[in-house]
Structures are given as C-alpha cells and as structure tokens.
Design a protein with these regions (language model features):
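Periplasmic N-terminal accessory/gating domains of Gram-negative outer-membrane beta-barrel systems
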Residues: 80, 86-247, 262, 266, ...
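Extracytoplasmic gating/loop element in the C-terminal half of outer-membrane beta-barrel translocons
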Residues: 710-718, 888-951, 955, 961, ...
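Periplasm-facing N-terminal accessory domains of Gram-negative outer-membrane beta-barrel systems
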Residues: 2-138, 217
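Gram-negative outer-membrane beta-barrel transporters
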Residues: 591, 754, 758-890, 894-898
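Hydrophobic, lipid-facing positions within transmembrane beta-strands of outer-membrane proteins
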Residues: 182, 237-239, 290-294, 380-384, ...
C-alpha cells in the first residue's frame, strides 16, 4: 500500500476516535487519606493531573477514606487532596507505569483549604498491591541500554525466567521459516503461546509470532507479565507483554538519530573461511549497518489535543557465515575406511577408494554453498498518534502505524548452504482507535477497536529444487516448504468496564477478534531428498566387514537417497475464524494490608472442520498481595491460574490441504524410501532425474514436475484410491487448545530508600501441547541387537502398509518448569541505577515444536521423549546498570551469562525402519542428552551529552556488543551416527563443523556501533 493511503487513514480518523486505555496500556492509583491521628477521612476530593498533558481525573474518598483512580496513561502526575477543615495537600512527581498499581498514603494537616502543603516524598519501590509476577521497563532504560538491533522486545530477555527461543544448540533446527514464533521462551515454553499488545491492541500473528510494529523511539514503556496475570489478559500460556507508545505533551519535543556500523571496527568470525585451491583461508565478513530515524511530538491544542510521530529505518548490508566446508578431508575416505582400505587387495581397494571419494561436482556444490555470503535487510517503521481530551471525563486517542520489511538471502548459518537462503517481504499497517470515559467517579468504560493487515511472502532465493539434505554435512537448494504467502486481516474489538464499590474493584470485559486469512503454502512442491548413513553392503562388494558404513556424503555421491518427498495441487486455503474472550475480575482489599485478586476468563477459539472448536476453555485465576509489615516495605505475593493459548492457523492449513477429506486431497503427496522395491525407490528417482538433468549438481537445473515423476508410477490425482506411500496429515478427534497451570510465590523487601530485593519460586505445568505423531505404526518388536523397536516388516508392522505416514496432530504434549528467582534492584540515586537477577531452573518437555521432523523417535511410546527441554537453561544471570560519571559521561552496561542448553543426538538415518529419517536417536539414547556450550557476554554503551541551547542537546554514543570478544559457540553438529553410550556429550572445539559434535556456528563476536542524536 502506498504512503498516501496511510496518510489518508490518519487524516480521516484523526477527528474521530482512538484507542482505549485499559490496564494493559495504563496504570492505577490507589490511596488512603487520614487525619493526624490516623483516622481515615471520607469524602475528600482527589484530583489527579498529568504533569505534561494536563489530563485531570477527580474522585472522592469512600467511607473508609480510600480511593482508586484506574486507567491512567503512564506518566508523571501530581495529586491534590482537598477537604474542608484541612490544608490542601499536593504530591508531585508521582510516576505511574503500565500495569502498575501505585499506592499513595496521605495525612492531612488541620487548617483552611486555601493553604497548600507540598509533599515530595519518594514513592515506595515495592508495589504493595500487585499480586502477579511482572517487570516494567521505562523509557530511561529503553533509550539508553545497549540493545543490538533497537528491538525493544529484546529487552524482555533481560527479565528473569525468560530465554531466547531462537537459539537452539542443535545444528539441525527443524523449525520452518513460514511459522515464526515470538523468539521468547517464558518459563521453558517453545516461543509460542505468548501474547504482545501495543496500546492494548494485539500484535500477534497466526503462528505464535509477533508482527512488526512501531519504532523504539515511539515506545513510552512496556510491562513484562511473566505469570499469574489477571483474567483481563488472555490468549497465552506463557508471557504477556504490554507496550505503550508515547504521546505528545504541551511542549514540542523531538529528535533525530543515527547509528552506524562498519566491519573495520568489528572482530572477525572464527568460522569465516573459504577454500582456495586446497587451502582454507580465513576472511573477514563485510558488514555495513545504518539505523536512523526521527520523532516529533507536541500540542495541537494546549491541554486538549496532542500528537506524536516517529519514523525509523534500518539498512543492513552484512554477511552470513556458512561453515559447510572447513575440512577438505571430508571428500575422501574416513580414517576408519582408510584403515580398512590398507588391508584389502589392490584390486578391491582401488575401485572402493574411488567410490568413497567425492567427485568434483560434489566439491563444487560445497564450495558454492560454503563461506561468507551477503545478506540485506531493509526495515521501515512509521507511526502517528493523536490524543484528545474530552474535558475531565473522557479521553480519545488514535494511532496508525506501518511497517515494511524486506530481507534478502536470510536464514543462512552453520550447515545451511547459500542456495537454501530465503527472501522475506512484509507489509503490516495497523490502525487502533478507542475511547476511555468516566461515567461516574466510580465507573469507567474503555472501548478499543483495531484493524490490521498482514501481508507476508517468504520464498527461497534459489528458485529451483529439490531440497537436498545430507545429514550432518549440509542442506542445499530450494526450501521444501516454500514459497508461502500469508494475507491476514484482523479486526479486534474490546470493551472493559471498571466499577469501584467499597473495598472491591470489579472489572468486566469482552473481546471479539475476527481473523481472516488467505494462505498459499506450496509445501512439498519443491521436493526433498534426504541422504544418511548406509551399511557398506549396499555396494555389493564381497569381503567387507559388517561394521563397514557409508557416511551421508558418500551416499549422496552414489545417489543413494534414503527418502524422497514431493507434493502437488492447490496450495490455497482461505477462511475466517473468530476468537471471543470474556472475563470478570475482582480486586478485593480484604484488609488494609491484604489484597485478593479473583477472576475467571472464558475463551472461544473457533475453527472449521476437520478441526473442532474447543468450547470449555474456562480459566479461573486467584492471586494475593500481603504486606506483613506496617511500613509496607515487604510484600508477599502469589497465585494460581489456568491460561489458554490459541490453536495456530498453520495446523488448520495442514489438516485441510494435506488431508483426505470426503475422498479428496487438495495437495497430493508421495513419499518413497530406498527400501521400496518398485521404480519409485527414492535412490532410483534421484539417480534417474539427475541423469536426465532435472536435478543439477552443483547448480539446480530446474524444478521437478509431476510429469517428471510419472515415469516412476507416482500418481498425483486428487480423488479416488490413494496411491502407494501417500503422506496424510490429520488431527485427532479430541484435539484441543493447549493450556498451562501457573503458580508462584514471592517475597519482596525494600531496604533503605533505594534498594529492593525479591525472592520468587515459579512452577508452570503446560498440558495439551500440540505435537505430531505417526499413527500408521503398530508396536513393533524390540530388536535384541539394538535394544529398540524396529519396524522391519513392511506389512505387519504398519496399520496400512500402503500409506507411508499418517501424521496426526495431537494434544498430548506436556511441559514442566520450576524456577527459583532472585532479583536485586536499585533505583536512580547518586547517578546510579541497577538491576540484577539470577534464575535457577529446570525445564522439562516432550516435544520441541509441531513439525514433522520433531516427531518422537518411538512413535508408539511418546513418554520416551520426556527430557530436558531444548529451552532449558539451568543457570541464567543478567545485570544491567546506568551510571552518570563526572563530565556528563554515561555508562550503561549489560552483562549476561547462562549455562548451556541440551541438544538432541541424531543418527542421521532411519535406524528403526519407521519411515522417518530425521527423528532417530542412537539406540538407547534419550532425547536432549547432549549439553551445549555456556554463554557470557558484556555489552557497553558510553555516551556524552552536549547542551547546544536551553532546550536542545546533542548526544554521542559508542556501543560495544560482546566487548571482550568472548567466543560463544552457538550450535553443534548433532548428527553423530549410531554411537554407544554414555550420551551426556558436549560440543568439541577440536572438531570441524562437518564432524560429529563439532561446533558449527558462534554468536556474534565484538561489534562496535557509533551513534548521534539531536534532542529538542
């Protein structure tokens, strides 16, 4: 859509409505008023005024001398208290943050009400009435901490109990590009099941990811709700992040900024090597990054109407490092094979050596795909917000935002070849509007409406297929599940009503989210060949020992593909599926030092056949906040609740497009193996198509078509009898929404004026997690030599021998998390503020994600996959600070350290004969028994501000990410063959990426960024 369209939207809506300030985008003020004797004062008049916008709210105290002011936009406030017979008291500099329940206790002095008493006491650090576990990051942190990409969601990783869901230790990361997740693992979750809101409007997509939204400069602050949040928040089994954007004020303010990087200042990458002749040469990847933007805010009409606009652009021209080829010896016999060759007669050894040695075409394939490759990112964000006050009883605001992203040659890393890169194009406009109205001093209504359009296109840079997966060595060519295009239109309407009655604060609300989607996903259309280890007996050479094995690279050279997968048909699914949510919540101040929060939420996540709608998603929640000490500097909080996540549309798509419904197949698929005795044998298909120049090595010749496959008897009709070795994807009849049971208990204590220490225990039990299982397998007998089930009989071991796989989505996965959290905070005092937290945790689950490659090793024993989660970090420590030194120098460091994550050992071929070649572990090995490398890094920003005029300043900053250039290995080659135990293995720095347990990639080495900002 053109920029003129978005400008038209802003101008046409500016005179109408805007977003409501519900508690997901606002805070509350609770207070008591007493006389000098401590007796509570009823009917006092409380006036709360925003210091920069003039927003005013007036409420009386009740019979108990208490008052509540909900739905306050984040900001600085002054509170005026008036009562006949007492002096008027004014408290200033009271900060209200998003999701906060601020408490103000006041004592009035006798006198006449035209006498004013100014109170400037500091607010307590401990939120004495907050019952759930949460953190709030204010603008001071957002603007000054060194964050690598100015992505404010990355700040969430600073919170305890949250880890990076994008960083698996397994080199074989089977999650697919078109089903992104949030990147945030709350309490051991897999990155899905979280929810993000901006100004109260949801910013999630249909797969559990987060949509592009606004510039970091447009963010006022955000709250991270880790667990036990109220019934007002829903659609998540993990965390909920509430982001609030900045508004204009009575003063014009704005700025320009730019941040710049160049590889001349950066450290090199240890995996950046290219093969020149027979020599590996280290090179330094090129890198250029410019990130720039501007913002402007101010009054349209003083004390009445305001605006704030922000723009941000990111241009990256950098390099990805692919470590496919760091050891040329992989193209010859292995050391064990060399030892055998020396014992064989020359007449046998010579031809065998030739078979074990890669041809030039294979060497060219690796050279073409390994090394350093450019990638580019262009990311643009723009937003305008308008606020309008309807006197003292109503507020309107409107925000329109637009995000555009284009990535070229992304997704390259480790053993993912250059021809497997992806191209992403995204357009995402959002308009949100609403109205907050004070109906009576004790009754407030919030109405909010949002419209979003999400257009995402993901394709492979290499337009031809098929995908070639050489287990443990590399993945090449067109991604087998691309291209894909998702068009979403989401209409979100919410209404919340807050009613104050005595010691109760009731909230009631409803939401209707209409999700319309047009999905075009050419899954399997490119085809995929998989190569793994095979016994040497396939060569037919007499005299070879039974232990002689061909590795995956050698089977590729010989054209011995273990499996082949292909699909064709109509890739389009379009439908509308609404979501409805309803809640009721009561915050009851049972005693002056005890608050009980009780609520229930009901969610109706509708779906169309063959999925069914789960109609019993009731989510009760209860929590408390208790202040055992009279000074209210100690708060004990805890709670329990049930939380539901949606079923993501990718599952709707698969069970409609890749299923057999009423005898029809929208996308017909075939699957063949090397064990097939017909012409459709996967090795025969590969060798024949390669000889016919349909498959080119090293350069793909063209895409495979159904006409090419007809010669093998492969049938792609979409009705009638199923052809042999069809793949089917279905959902279980009892397939339902995942849910979590969250419980926590914490104690927080303020020490002195500026320090606070908290101790928390959290336990989360997540059930009904989506997973895939092949239901076509019968329980097979245990092979006495291997000690595992082996499906060796192609007839008796399968429910339907003519079906290759019947993959069924089930609600059978489970996850368990327990964690102990210690957090120390110091608020700004003597130029220093600090936050440090430590998490000791254990995360256990049974599945990593819901793709076919994460199915269990033993499909008839799902419990055998219960193990430490891929997102388990036993120890995590984070500390960050802000210090202003003499000379107006500001230092803001972030130190992060965590223990290594588990990784899954894979054989690299179909060891147990179940027709799955990416799920097998070494015989006897449990899931995720390997332990990845530890991580630590120090980031630092140094800045200095120069005053140009009274209201204008120039800031210069220098940032170093991974200041000490510590080598943090990221992923491990987890294809190890059928090794014997023990299996508690770690990565090996003395091995190359193409060797088992060799490290395949590293996190960023030291990066330097220089920046400048003008503020006025």
């Amino acid at each position: 859509m053109s920029p003129f369209f978005h400008l038209a939207v802003i101008l046409s809506l500016a005179a109408s409505l805007a977003c409501a300030q519900s508690s997901v985008a606002s805070g509350e003020l609770h207070g008591t008023v007493a006389d000098p004797s401590g007796a509570l004062v009823p009917a006092a008049i409380i006036t709360v005024e925003n210091s920069v916008t003039g927003l005013t709210r007036t409420v009386p105290t009740d019979e108990a001398g208490e008052y509540r002011v909900p739905s306050l936009p984040p900001g600085e406030y002054k509170v005026k208290i008036q009562k006949r017979g007492f002096r008027t008291q004014v408290s200033s500099d009271l900060r209200i943050t998003v999701g906060q329940i601020a408490v103000l206790e006041s004592k009035l002095e006798p006198g006449v009400d035209n006498e004013i008493v100014l109170v400037t006491s500091q607010a307590p650090m401990v939120e004495s009435e907050r019952s759930h576990q949460a953190e709030t990051l204010q603008q001071e942190w957002i603007q000054n901490l060194p964050i690598n990409r100015r992505d404010y969601l990355t700040y969430t990783l600073l919170a305890p109990g949250v880890v990076d869901a994008t960083a698996l230790a397994d080199n074989a990361d089977f999650r697919v590009k078109q089903t992104p997740h949030s990147g945030l693992s709350f309490y051991g979750s897999n990155g899905r099941g979280n929810s993000v809101t901006v100004d109260g409007g949801e910013m999630n997509d249909t797969t559990g990811g987060v949509r592009e939204n606004v510039s970091q400069d447009a963010v006022e602050e955000f709250q991270i709700n880790r667990s036990n949040y109220s019934a007002e928040l829903g659609g998540a089994t993990g965390g909920v992040i509430n982001i609030v954007t900045r508004s204009g004020t009575n003063q014009f303010h704005g700025g320009l900024f730019g941040y710049f990087r160049n590889d001349a200042l950066d450290a090199g990458n240890p995996f950046a090597r290219v093969l020149e002749g027979n020599t590996l040469t280290r090179i330094k990847p090129s890198s250029r990054r410019e990130q720039f933007g501007a913002n402007l805010g101010g009054p349209i009409r003083r004390d009445r109407t305001f605006f704030f606009a922000a723009f941000e652009g990111l241009i990256r021209n950098e390099s990805s490092v692919v470590s496919l080829l760091t050891d040329p010896s992989i193209f010859g016999p292995t050391p064990d094979q060399e030892a055998l060759l020396r014992t064989l007669p020359a007449a046998t050894a010579g031809p065998l050596r030739a078979l074990l040695t890669s041809p030039q075409s294979t060497i060219d394939l690796f050279q073409r795909n390994s090394g350093v490759f450019p990638f580019a990112t262009h990311d643009w964000k723009f937003s305008v917000r308008i606020d309008h006050q309807l006197g003292s009883k109503g507020q309107l605001f409107l925000r329109h935002s637009y995000a555009h992203l284009h990535e070229q040659n992304a997704n390259l890393q480790a053993l993912v070849g250059a021809t497997r890169g992806t191209e992403v194009s995204l357009a995402d406009p959002t308009t949100i509007a609403g109205w907050t109205q004070t109906l009576t001093p004790r009754l407030i209504n919030d109405l909010r409406a949002q419209w979003n359009y999400h257009n995402l296109l993901t394709d492979s840079v290499e337009k031809y297929g098929p995908e070639i997966r050489i287990q443990g060595y590399g993945v090449f060519n067109h991604d087998w599940v691309l291209p894909t295009r998702w068009l979403e239109r989401r209409y979100d309407l919410k209404d919340h009503l807050t009613w104050q009655r005595g010691t109760h604060s009731f909230k009631f609300g409803a939401q209707a989210l209409i999700r319309g989607i047009h999905a075009e996903n050419k899954v399997f259309f490119a085809g995929r060949f998989t190569f793994g280890d095979l016994p040497g007996s396939v060569l037919g050479i007499p005299g070879l020992p039974d232990s002689f094995t061909l590795n995956a690279l050698q089977t590729f050279n010989l054209g011995l593909a273990q499996t082949f997968l292909y699909g064709a048909g109509n890739p389009v699914i379009a439908q509308t599926y609404p979501y409805y949510g309803f809640f009721a919540q009561d915050s009851w101040k049972l005693r002056p030092n005890l608050t009980i929060d009780v609520g229930v939420r009901y969610e109706l996540d509708t779906h169309k056949a063959p999925l069914r709608t789960d109609t019993n998603n009731f989510a009760p929640r209860i929590a408390f906040a208790w202040n055992p000490s009279a000074d209210k500097k100690t708060t004990v909080r805890g709670g329990y609740g049930i939380f539901y996540a949606p079923i993501y549309f990718q599952i709707d798509y698969v069970v409609q497009a890749l299923n057999v419904i009423n005898g029809n197949r929208q996308i017909a698929q075939v699957f063949s193996t090397i064990l097939d005795t017909t012409a459709a044998n996967s090795a025969n298909v590969f060798s024949t198509l390669r000889a016919q120049n349909v498959i080119g090595v090293p350069t793909p010749a063209r895409s495979i078509t159904t006409a090419d496959l007809a010669q093998f008897g492969m049938n792609f009709t979409h009705s009638g009898p199923l052809p042999p070795f069809t793949l089917i994807f279905e959902n279980a009849r009892d397939f339902v929404n995942p849910y979590s049971q969250q419980s926590s208990l914490s104690v927080e204590r303020q020490f002195g004026q500026n320090w606070a220490l908290s101790l928390e225990y959290a336990y989360v039990r997540t059930l009904k997690i989506t997973r895939l299982r092949d239901s076509n397998l019968k329980p097979a007998p245990v092979d006495p030599a291997l000690g595992i089930r082996v499906w060796s009989d192609p007839v008796r071991d399968f429910v339907d021998p003519l079906i290759a796989q019947r993959n069924i989505f089930e609600s059978s996965g489970r996850a368990f998390y327990s964690g102990l959290i210690v957090e120390l905070r110091r608020r700004l005092s003597r130029s220093l503020s600090l936050d440090a937290n430590y998490t000791l945790s254990r995360a256990v689950d049974e599945v990593t994600d819901y793709t076919i490659d994460y199915e269990p090793t033993d499909q008839t024993n799902m419990n055998a996959d219960r193990a430490l989660s891929s997102f388990h970090e036993k120890h995590k420590f984070v500390a960050y600070a802000m210090w202003t030194a003499p000379g107006n120098l500001q230092f803001t460091p972030i130190f992060r350290a965590n223990s290594g994550r588990p990784f899954n050992l894979l054989v690299g071929y179909d060891l147990n004969g179940d027709r799955h070649d990416t799920t097998d572990r070494p015989a006897g090995a449990g899931r995720n028994t390997g332990i990845g490398p530890d991580f630590w890094s120090l980031d630092l920003r140094v800045g200095r501000s120069f005053k140009l005029r009274e209201t204008t300043a120039l800031d210069f900053t220098a940032e170093a990410f991974n200041l000490f250039n510590h080598l943090n290995y990221a992923s491990i080659n987890n294809v190890v063959g059928n090794i014997t135990g023990p299996f508690n293995l770690t990565g090996r720095a003395d091995r190359t990426p193409s060797q088992p347990l060799g490290f395949t990639s590293a996190f960023d080495s030291r990066r330097i960024q220089l920046g400048a900002r003008v503020r006025f």
